[in-house]
């Protein structure tokens, strides 16, 4: 059990005066579990964006043109809203059972989507997938945190972050390839054998300890039902507003403003409720935000996730509308971010494990991202491949180092008993940031296009681009259709470039905000010992006592 001492982080010590022990060697069982967790993380990350390039084919086949947005949003909504719930339930029902349940739910959702014959079944399947995906993302981080010490977590977080980055970037390419060459249904069916292998491996090797949690009635009474309802309602309203804004309805319309205000008020009510004295186990306890380091790093994680999605959603606009790349080609053109963020994150994690120092990676990451976002403003129709590749490399290295270096110090500033809730909060805030990382630049882009559109001489083309139409028409097909009129094509591309320039400028402001926040993070000692009630059970032959902790039961 965590002691009061665990809750008080100590200042970072000099390595020369206090040498740290080498990390313990991991056996085959550990690596089998870690590979299985990484595979499920890859699948959950893959399904956040794999349908983006295949969506036109799916909607045409199912006849769901008017509801296409929900094929995307159902997954995002379900995964984000259920993350803190899985984190809390992991403390009550154990890590192993929740991990297996999450993988099973995700697999079921994949099967439903692959076999969908109408839009309702597809949206329902995506929602089921999202619940499982949110659980996988949460439980994978929690289980890894229970298997290694805080000091070692940076390295493994870097690997998982690399898996996520690679999946997010290759997903559109895979989706387009399946839709064009085989069938869009295999976008979902491919998950079944991979998830099945992971499920078997986790079932066989993921044997964890957990403390007694009482009777079924006692377990149910520990769940924060009120907080869960408020959080799900809040996320649902906010996602609705951000999905409708600028597309179905104008940002200034009541259809957008009302659900957005309701969602934000529900979020405020959720956090107020989390501080209620009668609440036994809050979904997201306020103590997670009670110290400067954890609260600052959670905000930094929000900004980092926002920026990652910001860039990954709007660079394809540049590639397709300005460089006239196909959707699949534009996805390939994003590879520099994935190919650099993954190794950079792993390298930063290894360094953190060896030295215990993490603040330098916060500063380094935001400096590199700031430089990259500033350089993005220089991109135009004549920019060489070397330019947009080089700028992405800077951003990829920066985003990889920040991702790896945020969770370990958050956990170091809190008692070990808060591992699950803190990890769940970190994962939720990252997902929540990704929602705004698409909505904010979209609003900025659409607003500037509306102001720049009068420069377009053709009124019919102008009408296609205003009020949110520019993002929808940022395609190779649309731009090439203007080729018979070179002057008009140049005008349209210039409007896109002006809108994108403002998008990059605003992203730079968020990078600088993240950099400033880095100064508020304290240097803490990353604990070398693993102190948890939910750790990996040691195989002890000829012994019925499978845990050194009295009262610990099999999960």
Curated annotation (Swiss-Prot):
In the record, the note on similarity to other proteins reads: Belongs to the major facilitator superfamily. TCR/Tet family.
Q: In the record, what terms sit under GO molecular function?
A: transmembrane transporter activity
Please list the residues annotated as glycosylated. Answer: 181, 291, 545
Report what the protein is called: Efflux pump FUS6
Note the SS bond partners. Answer: none
Q: What induces it?
A: Expressed under high amounts of nitrogen via regulation by GLN1. Moreover, components of the fungal-specific velvet complex VEL1, VEL2 and LAE1 act also as positive regulators of expression. Finally, expression is induced under acidic conditions in a PACC-independent manner.
Residue stretches spanning the membrane: 31-51, 67-87, 97-117, 130-150, 159-179, 186-206, 225-245, 253-273, 297-317, 332-352, 360-380, 393-413, 425-445, 501-521
Against InterPro entries, the record matches this protein to: MFS, MFS_dom, MFS_trans_sf
- Lineage of origin: Eukaryota, Fungi, Dikarya, Ascomycota, Pezizomycotina
* This protein's encoding gene: FUS6
Location within or outside the cell: Membrane
Task: State the organism of origin.
Answer: Gibberella fujikuroi (strain CBS 195.34 / IMI 58289 / NRRL A-6831) (Bakanae and foot rot disease fungus)
Report which superkingdom the organism of origin falls in: Eukaryota
Q: Phenotype upon knockout?
A: Does not alter fusarin C production.
Annotated membrane topology: Multi-pass membrane protein
Record region (Disordered): 1-23
Q: Which UniProt keywords apply?
A: Glycoprotein, Membrane, Transmembrane, Transmembrane helix, Transport
For this record, the Gene Ontology CC terms, alphabetical, are: plasma membrane
| Its biological purpose | Efflux pump; part of the gene cluster that mediates the biosynthesis of the mycotoxin fusarin C. Within the cluster, FUS1, FUS2, FUS8 and FUS9 are sufficient for fusarin production. The other FUS cluster members are not essential for fusarin C biosynthesis.
């Amino acid at each position: 059990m965590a002691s009061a001492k665990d809750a008080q982080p100590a200042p970072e010590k000099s390595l020369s005066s206090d040498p740290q022990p080498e990390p313990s060697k991991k056996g085959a069982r550990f690596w089998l579990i870690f590979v299985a967790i990484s595979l499920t993380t890859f699948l959950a990350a893959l399904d956040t964006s794999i349908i983006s390039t295949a969506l036109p084919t799916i909607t045409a086949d199912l006849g769901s043109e008017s509801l296409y947005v929900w094929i995307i949003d159902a997954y995002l909504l379900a995964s984000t809203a259920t993350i803190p719930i899985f984190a809390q339930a992991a403390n009550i029902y154990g890590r192993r059972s929740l991990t297996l349940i999450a993988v099973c739910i995700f697999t079921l959702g994949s099967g439903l989507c692959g076999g969908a014959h109408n839009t309702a079944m597809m949206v329902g399947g995506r929602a089921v997938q999202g619940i499982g995906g949110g659980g996988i993302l949460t439980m994978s981080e929690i289980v890894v945190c229970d298997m290694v010490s805080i000091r070692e977590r940076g390295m493994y977080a870097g690997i998982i972050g690399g898996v996520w980055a690679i999946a997010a970037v290759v997903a559109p390419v895979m989706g387009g390839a399946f839709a064009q060459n085989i069938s869009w249904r295999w976008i979902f069916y491919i998950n079944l054998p991979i998830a099945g292998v992971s499920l078997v491996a986790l079932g066989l090797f993921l044997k964890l300890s957990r403390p007694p949690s009482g009777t079924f009635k006692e377990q149910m009474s520990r769940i924060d039902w009120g907080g869960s309802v408020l959080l799900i309602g809040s996320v649902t309203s906010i996602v609705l507003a951000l999905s409708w804004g600028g597309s179905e309805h104008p940002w200034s319309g009541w259809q957008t403003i009302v659900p957005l205000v309701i969602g934000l008020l529900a979020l405020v009510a959720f956090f107020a409720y989390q501080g209620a004295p009668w609440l036994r186990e809050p979904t997201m306890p306020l103590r997670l935000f009670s110290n400067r380091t954890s609260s600052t790093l959670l905000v930094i994680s929000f900004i980092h996730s926002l920026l990652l999605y910001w860039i990954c959603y709007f660079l394809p606009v540049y590639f397709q509308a300005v460089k006239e790349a196909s959707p699949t080609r534009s996805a390939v053109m994003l590879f520099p971010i994935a190919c650099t963020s993954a190794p950079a994150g792993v390298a930063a994690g290894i360094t953190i494990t060896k030295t215990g120092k993490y603040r330098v990676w916060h500063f380094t990451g935001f400096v590199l991202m700031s430089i990259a976002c500033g350089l993005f403003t220089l991109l135009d129709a004549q920019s060489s491949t070397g330019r947009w590749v080089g700028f992405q490399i800077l951003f990829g290295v920066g985003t990889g180092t920040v991702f790896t270096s945020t969770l370990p110090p958050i956990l170091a500033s809190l008692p070990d008993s808060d591992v699950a809730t803190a990890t769940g909060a970190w994962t939720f805030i990252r997902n929540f940031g990704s929602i705004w990382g698409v909505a904010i630049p979209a609003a900025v882009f659409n607003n500037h296009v509306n102001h720049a559109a009068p420069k377009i001489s053709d009124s019919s083309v102008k009408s296609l681009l205003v009020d949110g139409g520019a993002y929808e028409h940022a395609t190779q097909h649309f731009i090439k259709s203007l080729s018979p009129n070179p002057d008009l094509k140049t005008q349209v591309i210039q409007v896109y470039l002006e809108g994108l320039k403002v998008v990059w400028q605003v992203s730079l402001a968020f990078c600088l905000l993240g950099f400033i926040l880095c100064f508020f993070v304290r240097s803490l000692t990353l604990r070398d010992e693993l102190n948890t009630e939910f750790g990996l059970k040691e195989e002890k032959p000829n012994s019925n006592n499978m845990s050194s902790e009295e009262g610990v039961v099999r999960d």
